[in-house]
Amino acid sequence: MSRYRGPRFKKIRRLGSLPGLTSKRPRSGSDLRNQSRSGKRSQYRIRLEEKQKLRFHYGLTERQLLRYVRIAGKAKGSTGQVLLQLLEMRLDNILFRLGMASTIPGARQLVNHRHILVNGRLVDIPSYRCKPRDIITTRDEHRSRALIQNSIDSSQKEELPKHLTLHSLQYQYKGLVNQIIDSKWVGLKINELLVVEYYSRQT
C-alpha cells in the first residue's frame, strides 16, 4: 500500500488530530458526531483506527509500519514503546519536532531534495535513524536556509521535547539530538498497545 497523498482534512475528521500530517485540527465535536453516526465501534475497528493514526501521522506505507513493528518486537522492552521510539527518531520526524518543517511530509521533502546535513554529511534518506549526539543542520545555501526559516517563522511555537535542542545563529539553525526520546514526549496521542495488538492478530 502506497503512502497517503489524498485530502488531509478527511483523515483528521475521522481519526482526530494528526500534527505530523497537517497543522489543521478537526472541528470541535466532529469526532463525536462521526462516532454517533456509525454506532458502537468494534474492537477490530478501534485497533485499526489506532494503527491508521500512527501510519498517517508519521507518513508511512503499510509495509514500512509493519517492518517497524517487527523490529520493535525483536528488541528488548515493551514492543509498543520501542515502536514509538523508532518512529520518533526518524530524521523526517526529528526535523518536524524541531520546527524545521511544518509537517512530516514537508520534512521528508527537505531531506529528499538534499537540504539536510547530519554531522556535516548530506543525508537524503528520510527514514535515517537519528542517534544521541547527532547534529542536524542545513546546507550552506540561501535556498536551504530560507526554507527552514519559513518553517520556523510559520510554525506554532510549541515546547521542544526534552530529547532535542535547537540553536540559531544568523539564520543558520542547528538541531541537537540529546538522547533517545522518552515516551511522554511522543508527538501523538496514541495507544501503541492497540497497534501492536492489531498486527499480532493479523499473523
UniProtKB/Swiss-Prot annotation:
It comes from the Eukaryota. Keywords: Chloroplast, Plastid, Ribonucleoprotein, Ribosomal protein, RNA-binding, rRNA-binding. GO terms for biological process: ribosomal small subunit biogenesis; translation. Its main location: plastid. The keyword Coiled coil does not apply. PROSITE patterns: RIBOSOMAL_S4, S4. SMART domains: Ribosomal_S4 (SM01390), S4 (SM00363). One of its GO terms (cellular component) is chloroplast. The keyword Chloroplast applies. One of its GO terms (molecular function) is structural constituent of ribosome. Pfam families: Ribosomal_S4, S4. It is found in: Plastid, Chloroplast. InterPro entries: Ribosomal_uS4 (IPR022801), Ribosomal_uS4_bac-type (IPR005709), Ribosomal_uS4_CS (IPR018079), Ribosomal_uS4_N (IPR001912), S4_RNA-bd (IPR002942), S4_RNA-bd_sf (IPR036986). Gene3D superfamilies: Ribosomal Protein S4 Delta 41, Chain A, domain 1 (1.10.1050.10), RNA-binding S4 domain (3.10.290.10). Residues 15-43 are annotated as: Disordered. Belongs to the universal ribosomal protein uS4 family. Part of the 30S ribosomal subunit. Contacts protein S5. The interaction surface between S4 and S5 is involved in control of translational fidelity. PANTHER family: 30S 40S RIBOSOMAL PROTEIN (PTHR11831), SMALL RIBOSOMAL SUBUNIT PROTEIN US4M (PTHR11831:SF4). One of the primary rRNA binding proteins, it binds directly to 16S rRNA where it nucleates assembly of the body of the 30S subunit. With S5 and S12 plays an important role in translational accuracy. This is Small ribosomal subunit protein uS4c. It comes from Illicium oligandrum (Star anise). The lineage of its organism: Eukaryota, Viridiplantae, Streptophyta, Embryophyta, Tracheophyta.
